């Protein structure tokens, strides 16, 4: 086999392959021999059918398989020799093997762009210090205290007010007919917390315990359920009870009951530690992104179309899932598939640029990701999605997604590696506006 490489672009290669007659005939002979071992034909023992009969009877299948097997062998040899890893599906352009004839075909595929990494060792970057204000801790304790409050019926007969909890029944009607799915009994509503529509809450605030009333409720135009968006209905409400919160004392007993802390001081320390850890991670990620954005401006390389397309698809799929959680579909955005692609394309291109840069840095820093680390990431994905780990892993392997997952882990490690070599200055947080 001989081949000639043509660089179609900085990220796409085309390989013209020529296969001599001897290799063609050998490939066909091997395929026929494989068929002979398993084929069953009347009048012949298994494995004893003459090769010529097998070839004539199963010519279409044999020649197709021989062509595919031979091309696959060549592809492995070519990409190994070129020391490249195809990013995209390898496109094959050619016919089928013919006995006694030379065979020519072409393959094309995309590869990572080649570029020189900028010098990132000692790169100046600022990272904001993690700071936790005592007022923030007080707010957390106040929320915990409020959540653990005892609900006590109010002594006087009055409508509910902000801060109260109202127990009620409600049902929606349109043209005098009940609307299916918009009703509940003994529903607990915390007033003043924007848990419900403003019209509904205003109506509830006019009804004392033991009484009922009705009024018009208008759903906003962007309501999650498109069937009700912008619609006005009649809501009938019966209030069973109005309750107020009796807050517990802020003491060691509250800390013990809230989370098994030995004291309120220990509880406050835990809140501070949790806030500090999350903010340190957030500020580090922000500084890393700032550093990466600056480094990306120092290089220029072409983007593989297949890689950008993959991220476009991922972003649109994320958008679809988010819309479904809101009870809506992508079509509710009023955009064509082409418009959606145009909308997410800049972000997809930026993700691709970042990924390519970090994978190149990962090679320079000799970053490695073990199979155990990949499995660990899959375990987390399985737990979040409620899927079986083995089923999920098999899906990732069969669809080639395992390599994308591995590359993401390499990119994450590479970011940490180059950030560790940066000149990081810790700065005070900017004053709140």
From Swiss-Prot:
Record has Lipoprotein as a keyword: no
Subcellular locations according to the entry: Cytoplasm
Alphabetized UniProt keyword annotations: Cell cycle, Cell division, Chaperone, Cytoplasm, Isomerase, Rotamase
One MF term in the entry's GO annotations: ribosome binding
Enzyme Commission code(s) on record: 5.2.1.8
Keyword Cytoplasm: yes
Record InterPro entries: PPIase_dom_sf, Trig_fac, Trigger_fac_C, Trigger_fac_C_sf, Trigger_fac_ribosome-bd_bac, Trigger_fac_ribosome-bd_sf, Trigger_fact/SurA_dom_sf
GO biological process: 'de novo' cotranslational protein folding; cell division; chaperone-mediated protein folding; protein transport; protein unfolding
GO CC annotation terms, alphabetical: cytoplasm
Domain of life: Bacteria
Residue span(s) of domain PPIase FKBP-type: 163-248
Pfam family, one: Trigger_N
Reactions catalysed: [protein]-peptidylproline (omega=180) = [protein]-peptidylproline (omega=0)
Top class in the EC scheme: isomerase
Protein family according to the UniProt entry: Belongs to the FKBP-type PPIase family. Tig subfamily.
Role according to the record: Involved in protein export. Acts as a chaperone by maintaining the newly synthesized protein in an open conformation. Functions as a peptidyl-prolyl cis-trans isomerase.
Cited NCBIfam families: tig
PANTHER family: TRIGGER FACTOR CHAPERONE AND PEPTIDYL-PROLYL CIS/TRANS ISOMERASE, TRIGGER FACTOR-LIKE PROTEIN TIG, CHLOROPLASTIC
Domain comment as written in the entry: Consists of 3 domains; the N-terminus binds the ribosome, the middle domain has PPIase activity, while the C-terminus has intrinsic chaperone activity on its own.
The name this protein goes by in its record: Trigger factor
Native source species: Nitratidesulfovibrio vulgaris (strain DP4)
Gene from which this protein is expressed: tig
